[in-house]
Structures are given as C-alpha cells and as structure tokens.
C-alpha cells in the first residue's frame, strides 16, 4: 500500500518507523525545517527518512498547486500525518484512495488543536492518550479509527508524558496499521458537542499568575518545564524561571505572591502555597530553591509578581475612526469596560456614543475623515492601535453611488493605512465577507478560498473590490515594510443600533433594519429575488467579543492574520429572516401600536437595486482561524438577536394609539 507521509518531531519518527515495519511503501515524506529558535530535543524526521532511503521535502507551503500536483501524481492509497504542523487542503486529503489519517496527541474529541501534551498538564488531567482519526477539512474532527489511553502520574512532566505518548503512538500504530492495509477499519464519528479546542502555546504562556491556586501553578510548571521554556515570575525587574515546584497545604494565608520562607522557598498563592524546589535566574544556572531565593535577594514578606515592575504599562490607546457607527459604538462600550484601554474617536455624528461622553477614558471629536486628515495623522502617531471603520457598506449605495463608495472606502482608507506604515502603528482593518464574492466553496476560508466577483458592468462589486484591494495593500505593507496588521471579516453582524430607520426609509440600510421599517410603517416586506439568498447572521455581542480579543492580541497571535467573524450555525435565507422577524414582531408588547402586517412582496433585484446589481446565493464562514487564534466561538442564537434588535428599534419609534 502506497503512502505519503507528513511528519515532524519524535512521534513523526515513530510513525515512519511503524509504517516501514508494517510493510507500507512510503513514496515521500514531508516535514518542516528545524527552526533556529526552537530547542531541538526531539528526533529528526529528515534523518529518519534518509536512513530508510525515502525522499524527504520541507516546502514552505505544501498546499501550493505545485506540491499538490506532485502529491497527486504519487497516487497514494493512504496519507498519514504524524505531528505535522500545517493543515492539509482538501485536494491533498482527497488524493488518497483509502483515506487520510492524522495521529493526534489527545483522546479526541477532547483537546483538539495545538499543544495537547502541554494543555492536559496545565488543566490537571489524570489521563490522556493518542488518537488516529480520518482527516477532514475541520482540524481534528474526523472519525476515530483507533485510540490508546495513557495515565498521567501526579508528578508527570511534559517531557516524561511526551515519551509515554511516543511509545503509545508506536503501540497504537503497530496494532492498527495492518488493519488499515486490509481497507476495512473502524470509523467512529466524534461527538462534536464534547469537543474542546485549544490554541498554540508560546513562551509567554509560562507566566505565573500568583493569584491562581498552588496546584494550578504546579500544573503549569509541570507542563512547561525543561526542555520547554519554563514557568516564570519576577522579583522587581528581574525574571526567574521555575523548573520544579509542588503545592503545599495548611500554611498560613497571605497575599498572593508573598514569600513565606526562603529555605525552603515557599510562595503564597491564591489558594495554598507553592514550594519552588528548583529554578534559575534568567541568565543564570539551574539551582535549588533556597539558593535561588538568595540569588534574587528574597526575604520573608517580599512580593513576587507576574510581570516586571518596570513593565507595568500604560493603557493601550485605541483610535476608532467611525466611532459612532454600528461596530464603533459597541466596540467602544466593550473597551471601556476594561481599564486597560483608552479610546480616541472621530465621526460625523455622536448620537450612538453620547452615553460615553464624560468618561475620562473616552475622547471624541466630531469630524469627517476626508477633512480632518491632520487630526487623524496626529492621533495615529499618538495611539497604539488603529481601527478605520468608516465605510459605505449598504448594497444599494454600491449601484447608486459607486464613485463615492470608491472615494471613501478605498482612497480615504488608503491614506490611513499609509500613516500607520509611516508611524509603525498596528492596524486592525475591517475587511468584509463581500470580498469572497461568488466563491463556490461551501464555507469561505480566509487562507484558501478564491475571491470571485462579477463583470465590470455589475457595479455592486465596487465595494467588494475596494476592500479586497486594501486587504492586498495591507498584506504587502506587512510583508515588505513590517506593518503590524490584522484583517477581520464580519459576516452579517446584527443587533441594536444597526443603521437607523431614517436610513432605511431611503433604502440605505442593511436587511433587518429595512424589514423592521416595513413592519413599523405597515408596508409590504420586499423580498429581493424571493429572498432565497442565504446568509450567516452574527450577534453584535459575539462579533465585538471576537474583535476585542483581536485588539488584546495575546501572544501576538493575530499579527499578519485574516480572521472571519461570523456564526455558521445561524444560516438562514432572507425570507426566513423576515419570517422570524415577523413572528417576533407579532408577539412584542408594543405590537398593537403599529399597523397590520401588509404581507410579503417578491421584487426583482434589478428593480430594487438598479441594473448594476448582482447577488450571491450563500455566504458561510469558516471560523477555524478564530478558534485557533483567539479561542472564539459564537454563542448567541439568531432568534435572540432578532428579538433584541426589533425591541431596540420599536422603542425608538414615536408610538401612536393602539390599533383597533
């Protein structure tokens, strides 16, 4: 049976050796070059491949068409991935006639994602294992073929557990590989409701929170001890690393981070006390805890912290252009709930953000971005993060005022981008789900889906293309001039303060606001082309939480990334949206103050939007990047969003006497 293998690390070596022992014909092995910054305590897949006389490659992008063609030309029966760090595209997965299999270091569906070895220790688990599963587009979500359980001892470290998992992988593969060879093997679908997903870990994740319990800190130490970078804390401005520690019970309570004794070195935590058994200063040598205390100049009663005293930073200054808009005002509210942020905003109106005026951390100027260029440049220079949210984003304007869309959405925003490059400021740019255009993929993926638009005479694409070109310009500035950026793509965010009913009266609003106006005025709800178009509707609170996490940018996860923000579970046609809205309207307490429902009316898009319009049948996001980079999953159901949006708008209407 011919196999193509993707592998890295010790488990990659174990997988290759198991395949050879089972008599598989490995035609090629794909691996990663060793990173100079990484501690190479593990075996080399490249060396293992060479010892077996198997061709080995380390492409920068294995999903490039050239590599896809090479893999397909090998006509593999099976594909195996053993700790390979990149996802494989569907074309590669589908090239294996029997199937593609991945070996994952946990008992799926638990601990999907990156670094499960470390995460299970951080979380204090007593059992883990390895899982061989079928590979599908969604990471770690395919049917389970085989599992091998591994007990976690109380004093287990990441390295000892790693060795156990490597042996478990060899044992599992020894049993299952001959079965796969027959073409008849078990496939048990995962219970996705039980899935847990974890992101990658970096050295900064070793920072000790002394307010955690002693057992939680001990678990962290075990999870990241040598050869990983280690758990760490600070005495004043000096960093120290903890290599071995244990939780103690029954000691006198004290403020978290307080040194209780120096021989042994014992620190008070948020629950119990922690004995530091071994550690070292940042540039020192490995030593016992009491010597570490002496080296750091510690005495009983001293305070240890989670960050250097000199690094306690000022608030992050966030510049929001278009702060009075739908996203801008909700984002401002979320940022002001966290004392770590200060908001500077510009917009041509202030009705939505008037509730923040007077907050000492909110600074607002009324103005137009096309006029106040000097103010904008000064504040880009002054602030840390820039969000240019000003844009014309209502479909009817794309055909009614295409040049104005281009001038504002592209030209004015390009100036802002260039100022961010000039002053080396981080930009979080609102791309759009519209950039995917008429893409035929079932779900739209930030890194792989094609961006397809219609002919030039369909002017509705001027918004999509303006945004796409800015995405490409920002990406190029990131590659060539070091611009720090994140592109986020909202998928049909809804909620209170989305447009307003006056905008809806002239057709310049999003779908739900237009539908609410029809109900309020007693006019027929117009279903463009029958309302068959499907969209994935996202609650504004879910969207803002994702955007807030992008601004936080823990471990710089979001730098240079594109992130879809949408709710694929809230997919509905525009007609279904209208029907759900009508049901909510009919049961609302204020219903009797409004005219009777006037029915639905189907309208051709060219009649409503003009001859330059063209629509898209579906638009569903992949949110894999959001899961992976910011640990985000939307939670609000569409019915709740509709109820809250309708309630907000009905309460803004000047009520008449109840209808008879």
From Swiss-Prot:
Which residues are catalytic?
Answer: 104 (proton donor), 434 (proton acceptor), 619 (proton donor)
**What is the taxonomic lineage of the source species?**
Bacteria, Pseudomonadati, Pseudomonadota, Gammaproteobacteria, Enterobacterales
Residues annotated as binding (6R)-10-formyltetrahydrofolate are: 114, 136-140
Q: What is its pathway? A: Nucleotide-sugar biosynthesis; UDP-4-deoxy-4-formamido-beta-L-arabinose biosynthesis; UDP-4-deoxy-4-formamido-beta-L-arabinose from UDP-alpha-D-glucuronate: step 1/3; Nucleotide-sugar biosynthesis; UDP-4-deoxy-4-formamido-beta-L-arabinose biosynthesis; UDP-4-deoxy-4-formamido-beta-L-arabinose from UDP-alpha-D-glucuronate: step 3/3; Bacterial outer membrane biogenesis; lipopolysaccharide biosynthesis
Point out the gene that encodes the protein: arnA
Its BP terms in the Gene Ontology are: lipid A biosynthetic process; lipopolysaccharide biosynthetic process; response to antibiotic
Record: residues binding UDP-alpha-D-glucuronate: 393, 398, 432-433, 460, 492, 526-535, 613
Q: Check the record and name the NCBIfam families matching this protein.
A: PRK06988.1 (NF005414), PRK08125.1 (NF005998), PRK11908.1 (NF008872)
Q: One of this protein's Pfam families, by short name?
A: Formyl_trans_N
Q: Which UniProt keywords apply?
A: Antibiotic resistance, Lipid A biosynthesis, Lipid biosynthesis, Lipid metabolism, Lipopolysaccharide biosynthesis, Multifunctional enzyme, NAD, Oxidoreductase, Transferase
Q: Extract one GO cellular component term from the record.
A: membrane
Region of interest: Formyltransferase ArnAFT: 1-304
Annotated protein name in UniProt: Bifunctional polymyxin resistance protein ArnA
Q: Record's InterPro entries?
A: Arna-like_SDR_e, Bifun_polymyxin_resist_ArnA, Epimerase_deHydtase, Formyl_trans_C, Formyl_transf_N, Formyl_transf_N_sf, Formyl_transferase-like_C_sf, Lipid_A_modif_metabolic_enz
């Amino acid at each position: 049976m011919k196999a193509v293998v993707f592998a890295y690390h010790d488990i990659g070596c174990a997988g290759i050796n198991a395949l050879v022992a089972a008599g598989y014909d490995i035609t090629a092995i794909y691996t990663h070059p060793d990173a100079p910054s990484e501690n190479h305590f593990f075996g080399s897949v490249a060396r293992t491949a060479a010892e077996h006389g198997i061709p080995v490659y380390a492409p920068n992008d294995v999903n490039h068409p050239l590599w896809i063609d090479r893999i397909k030309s090998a006509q593999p029966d099976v594909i195996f991935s053993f700790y390979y760090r990149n996802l494989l595209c569907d074309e590669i997965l589908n090239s294996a006639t029997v199937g593609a299999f991945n070996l994952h270091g946990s008992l799926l569906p638990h601990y999907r994602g990156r670094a499960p070895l470390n995460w299970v220790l951080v979380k204090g688990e007593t059992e883990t294992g390895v899982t061989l599963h079928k590979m599908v587009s969604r990471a770690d979500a395919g049917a389970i073929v085989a599992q091998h359980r591994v007990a976690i001892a109380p004093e287990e470290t990441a390295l000892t557990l790693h060795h156990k998992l490597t042996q478990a992988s060899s044992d599992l593969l020894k049993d299952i590989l001959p079965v796969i060879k027959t073409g008849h093997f078990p496939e048990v679908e995962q219970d996705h409701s039980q899935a847990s997903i974890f992101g990658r870990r970096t050295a900064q994740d070793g920072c000790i929170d002394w307010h955690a319990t002693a057992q939680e800190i001990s678990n962290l130490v075990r999870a990241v001890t040598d050869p990983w970078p280690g758990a760490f804390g600070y005495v004043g401005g000096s960093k120290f690393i903890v290599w071995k520690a244990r939780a103690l019970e029954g000691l006198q309570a004290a403020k978290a981070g307080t040194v209780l004794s120096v021989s042994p070195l014992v620190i008070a935590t948020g629950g119990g006390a922690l004995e530091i058994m071994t550690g070292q200063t940042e540039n020192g040598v490995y030593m016992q805890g009491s010597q570490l205390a002496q080296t750091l100049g510690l005495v009983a009663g001293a305070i240890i912290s989670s960050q250097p005293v000199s690094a306690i930073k000022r608030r992050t200054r966030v510049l929001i252009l278009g702060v009075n808009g739908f996203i801008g005002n909700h984002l401002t509210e979320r940022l002001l709930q966290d004392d770590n942020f200060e908001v500077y905003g510009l917009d041509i109106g202030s009705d939505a953000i008037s509730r923040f005026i007077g907050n000492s951390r909110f600074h607002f100027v009324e103005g137009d971005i096309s006029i106040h260029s000097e103010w904008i440049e000064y504040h880009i220079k002054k602030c840390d993060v820039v969000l240019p949210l000003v844009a014309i984003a209502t479909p009817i304007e794309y055909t009614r005022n295409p040049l104005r869309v281009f001038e504002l959405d592209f030209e004015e925003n390009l100036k802002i981008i260039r100022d961010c490059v000039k002053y080396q400021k981080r930009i979080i740019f609102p791309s759009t789900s519209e950039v995917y255009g008429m893409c035929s993929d079932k779900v739209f993926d930030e890194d792989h889906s094609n961006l397809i638009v219609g002919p030039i005479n369909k002017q509705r694409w001027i918004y999509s293309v303006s945004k796409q070109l800015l995405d490409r310009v920002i990406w190029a500035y990131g590659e060539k001039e070091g611009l720090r950026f994140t592109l986020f793509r909202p998928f049909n965010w809804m909620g209170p303060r989305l447009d307003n009913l006056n905008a809806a009266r002239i057709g310049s609003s999003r779908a739900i606001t237009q539908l609410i106006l029809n109900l309020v005025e007693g006019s027929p709800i117009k279903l463009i082309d029958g309302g068959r178009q499907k969209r994935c509707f996202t609650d504004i609170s879910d969207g803002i939480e994702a955007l807030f996490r992008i601004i936080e940018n823990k471990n710089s996860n979001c730098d240079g990334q594109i992130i879809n923000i949408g709710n694929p579970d809230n997919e509905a046609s525009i007609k279904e949206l209208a029907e759900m809205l009508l049901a909510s309207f009919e049961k609302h307490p204020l219903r009797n103050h409004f005219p009777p429902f006037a029915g639905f009316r189907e309208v051709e898009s060219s009649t409503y939007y003009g001859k330059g319009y063209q629509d898209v049948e579906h638009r569903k996001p992949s949110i894999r990047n959001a899961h992976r980079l910011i640990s985000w999953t939307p939670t609000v159901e569409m019915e709740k969003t509709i109820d809250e949006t309708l309630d907000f708008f009905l309460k803004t209407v000047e009520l008449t006497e109840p209808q008879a």
